[in-house]
Every structure is written in C-alpha cells, then in structure tokens.
Design a protein with these regions (language model features):
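C-terminal catalytic/motor cores of large multi-domain enzyme assemblies
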Residues: 1-240
Length: 240
C-alpha cells in the first residue's frame, strides 16, 4: 500500500508464483467434491493379460527409429476408444438430470503438470485415429499441456477420461469421475505374474484395468462387459 493524504490506496501486486497452482488445486478440489457428492460411483477391476500386446510392441518398435516408437499407453487408449463403440453408455455426459449420449469418442488423458496439478485434455475422435496418430497427438498434447497452450475444445470435449499411475509403480487406480462425464478408466503398472495357461504355469505381463462409473447411467453388468471388450481388443494389438 501507499499513503496518499489520509487514505490508503491498495496497489495491485503481481500474483505470487504459486497462485496459479493454488487456483488449479482449488478447481480440482471443487470438481472432485462435486463428483463424490452428486455421482453414485461404482467400481470394477479386471486383470488384463498384456503379453501379446507387449511382444507386438517390442517387435514393432525394434523395426523403427527411436523417434517413431510407440508407448504401450497408446494401445490402451485405442482399445478403450474402440470398446466404447460397443458400450456407448459410457461415452456420455449426465447433465440436468438426464443422460446425453455423445456422438464423438473424445478420450481425455490425465496429465500431471510439473509444477503440480492435473489436466485431462481430449484426444479427439480417438477411435478413428491409428496408433501412430494417437502417439503423435498424445506427445503434442502433453507438451502443450505443460506449456499452458491447450485449446478450449481439448478441455471441454472429453467424453470419458483415462488415468494411469503405472509409471509410479501403482498396481491399481480407482479414479473419481470428471463431471459431466459418466465414467473413468484407470490403468496400473504392468507386472509379471504367474498364470496358468494351457495347464502350465507361466509368467505373463498383467495390467489392472479399473472402471469408475456412474450408477445413474449404467450398472455393473454393462461395466463388466466394457472391461471385457477392452481386454479382448488388447489381445489383437495389430488390429488396433
């Protein structure tokens, strides 16, 4: 403040460096509190054998320069997007007490920001993109998210969100739905696990896939079929 005569005049100060982060945390808190207060969540988990996808990815990347290699995450995104064609009730919004089906499949991907906080912009029409297109667009999305240059449509258009904490070693993640969406899919870290295949014990690459869904829109039976569809699609990675 400066003093002019007998009156104190407030001088506008530059925002503190952490103001933006604090505002983001408050926005996240408000959205998540609203979600847990208003949305009757239910949760499902399904272990998916990624061994075939893992081998296909290794073989594919071995033939490519480093700059063109794929991450396994794009296979997960594509499988979820295609599974939504079979389970469209999870590709919807719930607005003003009614379910609103969405025509496009716009998969939001949760991205942690370096300074703290989280955004979940959309890969638009993810079901129509090749895995190579998804890889390029995902890398671009991450770069622009961390640079603060996302487009408004990328914030507002997600019809479902995928979250993954696999790179942090978490086995299973159960997400909180972003309103007005009606579902979130979570992936943990792939891990070697002893499994019985053809009556023999063998090591397989397993990943936990979870579903958080809105019970006003779907039920556990349909949720289970959705997770099974994701599993089935990942068994044929060359067709994604």
């Amino acid at each position: 403040n400066v003093i002019a005569g007998s009156k104190a005049i407030a001088v506008k100060q530059a925002p503190a460096p952490d103001d933006k982060q604090a505002r983001m945390r408050q926005a996240i808190a408000n959205a998540m509190a609203r979600s847990k207060r208003e949305i009757p969540h239910y949760y499902l988990r399904h272990g998916i054998d990624l061994t075939s996808a893992w081998q296909w990815l290794a073989d594919t990347n071995a033939k490519r320069p480093v700059t063109e290699r794929l991450l396994y995450g794009v296979l997960l995104v594509k499988a979820v997007a295609l599974a939504l064609r079979e389970a469209p009730e999870f590709n919807a919004w719930f607005v003003d007490g009614r379910t609103s089906a969405r025509s496009g499949i716009h998969v939001g991907v949760a991205i942690a920001l370096r300074g703290g906080g989280l955004v979940a912009p959309a890969l638009l029409d993810a079901d129509k993109q090749s895995v190579d297109q998804l890889m390029r667009n995902f890398q671009d999305l991450v770069q622009r998210a961390r640079a603060g240059s996302l487009r408004s449509s990328e914030y507002s258009e997600p019809t479902i969100t995928i979250t993954s904490l696999g790179d942090r070693g978490v086995d299973t993640v159960y997400g909180i739905i972003f309103p007005p969406q009606v579902a979130m899919v979570g992936f943990g870290a792939p891990r070697l696990q002893a499994c019985v295949v053809n009556n023999a014990i063998t090591a397989r690459q397993i990943i936990d896939c979870s579903l958080s869904a809105d019970h006003r829109v779907s039920d556990g039976h349909r949720g289970a079929l959705f997770l099974r569809a994701i599993d089935r699609l990942l068994q044929a990675p060359e067709k994604l």
